[in-house]
C-alpha cells in the first residue's frame, strides 16, 4: 500500500505528541482494534494484519482498514558515509496515535472477531485493545 502520487517525495519525521484527531470510534463494523500507543505502522504490517484477519475469518464477515500509509520513510544505502543529503524513499508508514481505530470487522461473533483481531495485533509493534461499537448521538 502506498499513495498513487504525492506532492513531495521525502517528508520530515514529524511529532508524535497528542491523541488521535480522528477515527477514534468504530463507525463501519461492529468490533474494532484501537491503539493504546503511538508509533509508525508500515504498509507491510498493515498487509500482514489484513491477511491474518482474513485467514482466520475465512469468507465470513467484512473487514475495514481504517489507516493508510501516506508517509514516506527514507533510508541511505549500506556502508555510506554520513552527509551527502537525505536517502531515497524506502517504505511507507501510517502515523498512529493513541485512540486510533486500525481495523473493524462485522457480521461475525464477538469471539471470532476478538480472536481475529488478536492475531492481527501480534503483527504490530504497538499495544492495542479490542473495542465494540457504541451508539453516538
UniProtKB/Swiss-Prot annotation:
One of its GO terms (biological process) is translation. The lineage of its organism: Bacteria, Pseudomonadati, Chlamydiota, Chlamydiia, Chlamydiales. Transmembrane segments: none annotated. Part of the 50S ribosomal subunit. InterPro entries: Ribosomal_uL16, Ribosomal_uL16_bact-type, Ribosomal_uL16_CS, Ribosomal_uL16_dom, Ribosomal_uL16_sf. GO terms for molecular function: rRNA binding; structural constituent of ribosome; tRNA binding. Keywords: Ribonucleoprotein, Ribosomal protein, RNA-binding, rRNA-binding, tRNA-binding. The keyword Plastid does not apply. This is Large ribosomal subunit protein uL16. GO terms for cellular component: cytosolic large ribosomal subunit. SUPFAM superfamilies: Ribosomal protein L16p/L10e (SSF54686). Binds 23S rRNA and is also seen to make contacts with the A and possibly P site tRNAs. Pfam families: Ribosomal_L16 (PF00252). CDD domains: Ribosomal_L16_L10e (cd01433). Belongs to the universal ribosomal protein uL16 family.
Amino acid at each position: 500500500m502506498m499513495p498513487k502520487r504525492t506532492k513531495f517525495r521525502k517528508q520530515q519525521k514529524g511529532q508524535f505528541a497528542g491523541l488521535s484527531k480522528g477515527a477514534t470510534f468504530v463507525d463501519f463494523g461492529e468490533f474494532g482494534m484501537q491503539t493504546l500507543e503511538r508509533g509508525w505502522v508500515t504498509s507491510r504490517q498493515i498487509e500482514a494484519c489484513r491477511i491474518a484477519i482474513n485467514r482466520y475469518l475465512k469468507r465470513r464477515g467484512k473487514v475495514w482498514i481504517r489507516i493508510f500509509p501516506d508517509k514516506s520513510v527514507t533510508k541511505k544505502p549500506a556502508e555510506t558515509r554520513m552527509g551527502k543529503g537525505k536517502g531515497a524513499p524506502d517504505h511507507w508508514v501510517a502515523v498512529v496515535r493513541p485512540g486510533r481505530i486500525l481495523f473493524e470487522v462485522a457480521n461475525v461473533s464477538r469471539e471470532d472477531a476478538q480472536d481475529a483481531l488478536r492475531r492481527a495485533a501480534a503483527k504490530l509493534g504497538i499495544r492495542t485493545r479490542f473495542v465494540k461499537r457504541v451508539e453516538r448521538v
